[in-house]
Amino acid sequence: MEPYALTIHEARQLLDKKEISSVELTRSVFDRIERVEPKVGAYITLARESALSAAAAADTRLQSGGIAPLTGIPLAVKDLICTTGLRTTCASRMLETFMPPYDATVIEKLKTQGAVITGKVNMDEFAMGSSTEHSALGSTKNPWNLACIPGGSSGGSAASVAADMCLGSLGSDTGGSIRQPASHCGVVGIKPTYGRVSRYGLVAFASSLDQIGVLAKDVTDSALLLSAISGHDPSDSTSVPREVPDYAASCEKGLSGLTIGVCREYINAEGLDPEVADTVNRSIEHMKAQGAACVEVSLPHAQYAVAAYYVIAPAEASSNLARYDGVKYGFRDPEADSLLEMYARTRSRGFGKEVQRRIIIGTYCLSSGYYDAYYRKASQVRSLIADDFKKAFETCDVIVSPVAPTPAFELGAKTEDPLTMYLSDIFTLSANLAGVPGMSVPGGFSSTGLPIGVQLIAGHFNEPALVRCAWNLEQAVNIANKKPAL
């Protein structure tokens, strides 16, 4: 096996035994990037020189015995997480040359462990999209079928992991942006509980929904990554001071004593692809065969999640993105003759169509006379959705559902139909609105060879139950070693 194809835990064993060095591992990853990146287009910025320097430092650390789980491991980072010395573009013309003056807390945590950052990966502009086609710096393709989308907005994160162009990646999830691309690219993705991972240094889209998470080749790797980036951060007022468990310790526990909930509103949803439904139902049977109990649960207000989300998220985005006006940093239109013209031209030329659309929607929802009719009502629906989850978790530990209604669709199929694109996240939005953790784990493949993920959702801070359930499902399905033919 080539070093770039290793999982994190496999690489960890070889590094600890001195059977491979971090420099050798990192060079292997960059050789792989050189071969397949022109096909996939996962990266915005490569950091070969600094990565090899970090790998050499990791090797020195390995010799001295100061080893952490991620020491010497090459990882990619979604390009809306701030990195000192490495531009952070948000896949937007507005920030195309922006160099952050500080590292995000999660980046500090990775560097403290001695991880190697390979570069910044592509995304939908400012994380607004479900296909990674809304990037000002080029679209990313699905490694399993280069004519298809990888999902979004963390499409570069998922594609880089699936294509073995890193051993793991950081992403962010505002309405499904980790779980949906993880499903489409056949990798594991975790959106943690809101407040579990610091958002300091994450460029904001919708602050009450955004959450940094991880994408990995298998469940064990995802657990290792999540443990590494979790924990309280005084720099983030929404960060929760709660002890971080060893998530990987949940991997080899059986499912006896665990209860899974089947939400019929999701399983019987209109527009659900039959192959996706079959994959979810088979996964439920796998978990029952391994000792899990199964009950039906109801999320009666889930049908309103899309409507509520597309009021709340654009409203918060319109506020967060007001800071990009061409004055302090970022793109500035050089042809404006007045301050007001500079604002208008900068924002109309610096933001793409989808970002402009959501800013306009959000501004309208917050405008005088419409706040109560839209934003307040959406916030009330959000509370009802959170209550639905609370009631469901009184009878089960983990809810099993689809991640997306269909496998990955073709590039360009939905770019001119925003409403159809928005419905791609119909099964993932509710977890963000409720602030609960969600996870996508590979469950099988479509008849055309495209990956299909299964979503697992747990109560607040019950990520160990997600990992436990996902690991057992992974063992039963036994497709973690299947790779795209690039």
Curated annotation (Swiss-Prot):
GO molecular function: ATP binding; glutaminyl-tRNA synthase (glutamine-hydrolyzing) activity
Catalytic-site annotation from UniProt: 78, 153, 177
Protein name per its UniProtKB record: Glutamyl-tRNA(Gln) amidotransferase subunit A
Quaternary structure annotation from Swiss-Prot or TrEMBL: Heterotrimer of A, B and C subunits.
Keywords associated with the record: ATP-binding, Ligase, Nucleotide-binding, Protein biosynthesis
InterPro entries cross-referenced by the UniProt entry: Amidase, Amidase_CS, Amidase_dom, AS_sf, GatA
Catalytic activity: L-glutamyl-tRNA(Gln) + L-glutamine + ATP + H2O = L-glutaminyl-tRNA(Gln) + L-glutamate + ADP + phosphate + H(+)
Superkingdom in the source lineage: Bacteria
EC number: 6.3.5.7
GO biological process per UniProt: translation
Functional note: Allows the formation of correctly charged Gln-tRNA(Gln) through the transamidation of misacylated Glu-tRNA(Gln) in organisms which lack glutaminyl-tRNA synthetase. The reaction takes place in the presence of glutamine and ATP through an activated gamma-phospho-Glu-tRNA(Gln).
Gene transcribed to yield this protein: gatA
